[in-house]
């Protein structure tokens, strides 16, 4: 199945790139017909969405089999978390999401891949920005627990999720209440696979509309 996904994704990329290039050329033309301009805009948005889906499929396929390059170095999770959070200020502000960050003064030093850890944080925060109930708080805790570093993300979902955390992690499975939001639904699955190739663990807990993601990594000290 993984090989099939990879092959199909590669086969789609070539004609899709051609479509995107032609749409770009059309957008540069001086078109007076407002309906035609609107159609071109739809083509541009949907082709970009399809491109992102293909990229997610390829990454999910590689990550699920562990077929990714991993360069482990000593990192401080708290610093990288704060940096990634800073990139979401604008998105969270649009939904009036208030981040409550509770970060330990202790260093959370782990052996991990900087690029993959960033992608894990990015996918989790992107999921929150899409599905969290507007005008609510997002709680993020980063702490030491024995020989482990733990980072948890908690938010209130827009709608109750009538599935378990395990079901949500299944590829291509998303709660019915989320289907009106664009996206591949692969973000958390990719985050889980990338966490595991770095010897970490990602768990999801769902209780009604309460959504929690917890990351655990062995401390390198």
Predicted regions and their residues:
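Conserved glycine-rich
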Residues: 97, 199-202
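Short conserved segment of the HATPase_c
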Residues: 105, 160-173
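Conserved catalytic submotifs in the C-terminal HATPase_c
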Residues: 71-73, 98-108
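Short alpha-helical segment of the dimerization/phosphotransfer core of two-component systems
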Residues: 45-50
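Short helix-loop "hinge" at the ATP-lid/N-box region of the Bergerat-fold HATPase_c
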Residues: 127-129
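Conserved micro-motifs of the catalytic ATP-binding
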Residues: 65-70, 109-113
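A conserved beta-strand-to-alpha-helix junction within the catalytic ATP-binding
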Residues: 71-85
């Amino acid at each position: 199945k993984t090989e099939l996904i990879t092959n199909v994704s590669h086969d789609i990329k070539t004609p899709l790139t051609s479509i995107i290039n032609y749409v770009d050329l059309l957008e540069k033309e001086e078109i007076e017909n407002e309906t035609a301009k609107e159609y071109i805009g739809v083509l541009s948005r949907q082709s970009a969405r399809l491109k992102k889906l293909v990229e997610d499929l390829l990454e999910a396929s590689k990550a699920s089999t562990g077929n990714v390059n991993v360069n482990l170095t000593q990192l401080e999770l708290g610093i990288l978390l704060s940096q990634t959070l800073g990139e979401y200020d604008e998105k969270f502000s649009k939904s009036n999401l208030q981040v409550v960050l509770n970060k330990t003064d202790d260093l959370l030093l782990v052996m991990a891949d900087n690029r993959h850890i960033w992608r894990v944080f990015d996918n989790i925060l992107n999921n929150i920005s899409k599905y969290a109930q507007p005008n609510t708080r997002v709680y993020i805790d980063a702490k030491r627990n024995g020989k482990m570093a733990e980072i948890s993300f908690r938010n209130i979902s827009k709608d109750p999720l009538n599935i378990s955390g395990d079901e949500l992690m299944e590829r291509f499975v998303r709660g019915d209440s989320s289907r009106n939001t664009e996206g591949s639904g692969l973000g958390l699955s990719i985050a889980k696979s990338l966490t595991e190739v770095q010897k970490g663990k990602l768990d999801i807990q769902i209780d009604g509309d309460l959504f929690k993601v917890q990351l655990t990594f062995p401390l390198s000290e």
